UniProtKB/Swiss-Prot annotation:
Source taxonomy: Bacteria, Pseudomonadati, Pseudomonadota, Alphaproteobacteria, Rickettsiales
UniProt signal peptide: none
Region (G1): 365-372
InterPro entries given in the database record: EF-G-like_DII, IF2_II, IF2_N, P-loop_NTPase, Small_GTP-bd, T_Tr_GTP-bd_dom, TF_IF2_bacterial-like, TIF_IF2
Annotated stretches, region: G4: 466-469
HAMAP family in alphabetical order: IF_2_B
Protein name per its UniProtKB record: Translation initiation factor IF-2
Disulfide bonds: none
Gene Ontology MF: a single term: GTP binding
Keywords noted in UniProt: Cytoplasm, GTP-binding, Initiation factor, Nucleotide-binding, Protein biosynthesis
Length: 856
């Protein structure tokens, strides 16, 4: 094995370096006194160096004695190597001690100038404060230097590798120590030369140290720092610290990236990745709920994308923005077209088998012509007795069975003018219209309207001339009147069946039923049964015991208990129960069958369509899509003319809270109220809803100064007491006529009287007695009409009105009078202080007349 020298530098108080020569083949013994200190391990090699710092340097003698410990340690090897120091090296040591003494004196002279350098040394001290601790697998060798720094080395099994590791560590120790000494003793050229010569003499090892020194200086980029030997302990700087610093930098970068990921991507270990369905438009709140993320986090990411600060939960996002946000949270997404969803729902069953179904017959006609009575006679029921004053206020749907297996579905519509929308919706779901005309009244306005609805819907029609049992009934007169409106009876060569009937006497009811079945057979009515159910909402209301109740007619498919339905753009829910018109429970409903369903979350508008969907989530998506379409349509409406806003605000308002039993009644009343128009007053329906009067309705009426209109609903005792305390008026009605009439009366009372100026006389000025600040005293003659005290006077000069005022005082001679008629003279006090010309000035007398206005 080649031998090379390894140098262990022991720092003396003078700053000199003492060298001890060891052979690489020598084996180091282990010191039994091992003190544990602060340490950190570095797996640079299997050899580890533990450096312990001393508190304070001893004197030069103690340093010399400490340096001899290395020489006196037992070394396994040849006995001839025990005295390892040569004579030349001993002389060098003595010279080093002498130089150290000289350097100490020079250091004392320059200590004041080096105070600022000592401050830099503190930072260097902090960097090398931590000792390096390397543990060898076997025994330990304690090497003590004069700086009281202890290096504990453990030999390894392979002595060759162990020798090389010890050599590298000791050489590295010398390199760092020499660097620090050079910084402190720049002027000591002899010592610097000795160290340089020694490093160059080491050959390959010296080159390595130069390379380390160069890399160390390039990385640090700092000037060499001078350390005062009298004040601070010199520490061994290892190149290992550079790698530790790089590791620290890598850890800082890793921490920064981890924090950045938490802020931007919110990536969390074991986070659930969700698949988010993104429609064309979605709100911030809905998107956050779909991802199960906090809304605040979604808003933060959205701010990074758009740069907007004022992001609300209800703001809509398009599909592109939503997809970017979903990816930012490491979720996946799928674009969903809700328009396609709705089309797919309604396209189900188009190519399936068609099965015959029952006809849907709508009974229409003018009010009080006997529509409900006719249905009662056909159904053998007594619905009309349950209606207030015998007037139908709602749409009713019934199904009867004829001849054992033939079924007919009847829809009864109100005949009042206000229910025009109901009749229009009734024709949209019907197959056949039975137009009821009273034989004694003939064709009436709602009869004509019903005929127009039939023509618009292009459905078959049968005319039932009711009350044929009356003595003044004239069938020919009815058929001729129908001819004027384009309805040609079979007796006149047309295709419209006219059946004279009597609901009261039950005349020709079988003929009417047969006519309905005949037309139904001709129409060949069929529908698909084996598909998702869809149809129309006939009526809806809120029941205090059952909640929302909706009357539906199934037009396609089969509706079952447990199905989830969507009705219009605001109501959906699971069908909990179904009942027929007679109150019987039903499990399924086939096409043309009317049923009452329970379970919707909201009251749907009558006339809207319903359809069965797969899940509540799909139901919500469909509702949102329809509401978006509605918002788009509303946004297309023309904006309010700003020039009319001021005039609109000046119009008086009657605030109304409307509560009805069913949605159809609400629409009918709103339709009728909307027809009441006046330029100076209007009705503002502040709130409308289905159900009984509640405390919240009373409180709303109090804050908005409204009246409450209750149609076919009740008010409990507590609500009545609250309304009495708040002085809120609640008006109850059971007939729509009464509501409209009362609203007109209330509006009439709110209208201000119309004031008009009516000329009642003319005065000519005869003499001007005085003109002053208090007015003018004039002598006048009544040329026409009369003049009254306090009347309005318009002073006219050359056909121009130069003054308008009132007569403050009216006298005849010395007496105050109330009026003076034509042909008499009078004196007046006029509130006018300018010059008056008796010859040319004329005064016209006017009286303010108030005209009471009435809303028709």
């Amino acid at each position: 094995m080649n031998e090379s020298k390894s140098v262990a530098s022991n720092e003396l108080t003078s700053g000199k370096v003492e060298r001890t020569t060891l052979k690489l083949s020598d084996k180091l013994k282990i010191s039994s006194n091992i003190q544990q200190g602060n340490k950190f391990s570095l797996n640079k090699s299997i050899t580890t160096v533990e450096v312990r710092k001393s508190k304070k340097r001893k004197n030069i003698d103690e340093a010399a004695r400490s340096s001899l410990l290395l020489q006196n340690n037992d070394i396994d090897g040849n006995s001839e190597d025990k005295n390892s120091l040569t004579i030349q090296e001993q002389i060098s040591r003595m010279n080093a001690l002498q130089n150290a003494s000289n350097n100490e004196k020079r250091e004392e002279l320059s200590s004041d100038s080096n105070k600022h350098i000592e401050e830099e040394v503190i930072s260097v001290k902090a960097e090398v404060e931590q000792p390096v601790d390397v543990v060898l697998p076997n025994d330990n060798l304690l090497i003590e230097s004069d700086s009281s720094e202890k290096v504990i080395v453990d030999p390894v099994t392979d002595s060759e590798h162990a020798d090389k590791d010890v050599q590298d560590v000791v050489m590295l120790d010398e390199f760092v120590s020499s660097n620090l000494d050079d910084a402190g003793d720049q002027k000591n050229g002899d010592q610097s030369d000795d160290i340089s010569d020694l490093l160059e003499h080491k050959g390959i090892e010296g080159k390595k140290l130069k390379k380390y020194e160069k890399e160390h200086e390039e990385k640090k980029g700092n000037p060499k720092k001078v350390m005062s030997n009298n004040t601070y302990t010199k520490h061994v700087k290892l190149v290992i610290e550079e790698e530790l610093e790089e590791d620290n930098n890598k850890q800082v970068i890793k921490n920064y990236r981890s924090k950045k990921n938490r802020v931007t991507n919110r990536s969390v270990k074991n986070k659930i990745t969700r698949k988010v369905l993104i429609p064309n438009k979605i709100t911030v709140q809905e998107l956050a709920n779909s991802m199960s993320e906090r809304v605040k986090d979604v808003q933060q990411v959205l701010y990074q994308i758009t740069g907007k600060h004022d992001i609300k939960l209800t703001d809509y996002l398009d599909s592109d923005q939503a997809s970017i946000i979903v990816e930012a949270f490491n979720h996946t997404f799928k674009l969903v077209d809700n328009a396609k969803l709705e089309n797919d729902l309604y396209s189900d069953g188009n190519n399936m088998e068609l099965i015959p179904r029952a006809p849907v017959v709508t009974v229409m006609g003018h009010v009080d012509h006997g529509k409900t009575s006719l249905l009662d006679a056909i159904r053998e029921s007594n619905v009309v007795d349950g209606e207030f004053k015998g007037i139908t206020q709602h749409i009713g749907a019934y199904q009867i069975t004829l001849n054992g297996d033939k079924k007919i579905t009847f829809i009864d519509t109100p005949g009042h003018e206000a229910f025009a929308a109901m009749r229009a919706h009734g024709t949209n779901v019907t197959d056949i219209v039975v137009l009821v005309v009273a034989a004694d009244d003939g064709i009436m306005p709602q009869t004509i309207e019903s005929i127009n609805h039939v023509k618009a819907a292009n459905v078959a029609m049968i005319v039932a001339v009711n009350k044929i049992d009356k003595h003044d009934a004239d069938l020919d007169r009815i058929t001729n009147a129908l001819l004027q409106h384009g309805v040609v009876a079979e007796s006149l060569g047309g295709d419209v069946i006219v059946v004279p009937v009597s609901a009261k006497e039950k005349i020709n009811l079988d003929q009417l039923k047969s006519s309905i079945l005949l037309i139904a057979d001709l129409l060949e009515l069929k529908a698909v049964y084996n598909t998702r159910a869809s149809g129309t909402v006939i009526e809806s209301k809120v029941d205090k015991n059952c909640g929302v109740v909706a009357t539906l007619i199934v037009q396609k498919g089969t509706l079952k208990v447990g199905d989830i339905i969507v009705a219009g753009n605001q109501a959906y829910g699971r069908v909990r129960n179904m009942f027929n018109a007679d109150g019987g429970s039903e499990k399924v409903a086939i096409p043309s069958m009317p049923v009452k369903v329970f379970g919707l979350n909201n009251v749907p508008n009558f006339g809207t369509s319903f359809i069965v969907v797969d899940s509540e989530k799909q139901a919500r998506e469909l509702i949102n899509y329809r509401q978006d379409l509605l918002n788009v349509e509303l946004s297309k409406q023309p904006a309010i003319d700003k020039s009319n806003v001021l005039l609109y605000d000046m119009v008086d308002e009657l605030n109304v809270i409307l509560k009805c039993d069913v949605m159809g009644s609400i629409e009918a009343i709103c339709y009728s109220i909307g027809k009441i128009t006046h330029k100076d007053i209007r009705v503002n329906i502040l709130y409308k809803g289905v159900g009984n009067i509640t405390k919240s309705d009373v409180l709303l009426a109090e804050t908005s100064n409204s009246i409450i209109l209750a149609f076919n609903v009740k008010t409990d005792t507590q609500v009545k007491e609250l309304a009495k305390q708040k002085n809120i008026e609640i008006k109850h009605y059971f007939v729509i006529y009464d509501i409209i009439d009362d609203i007109k009366k209330i509006l009439t009372g709110m209208l201000k009287p119309l004031k008009q100026e009516v000329q009642i006389g003319t005065l000519s000025v005869r003499k001007v007695f005085s003109v002053g600040n208090n007015g003018s005293v004039l002598g006048c003659y009544v040329t026409s009409g009369l003049v009254k005290k306090g009347a309005l006077v318009k002073l006219v000069r050359n056909n121009n009105i130069i003054h308008e005022g009132k007569i403050k005082v009216l006298r005849r001679f010395k007496d105050d009078v109330k009026e003076v008629t034509a042909g008499f003279e009078c004196g007046i006090l006029l509130d006018y202080s300018k010059e008056i010309y008796p010859e040319s000035d004329v005064m016209n007398i006017f009286e303010i007349v108030e005209e009471i206005r009435v809303i028709q």
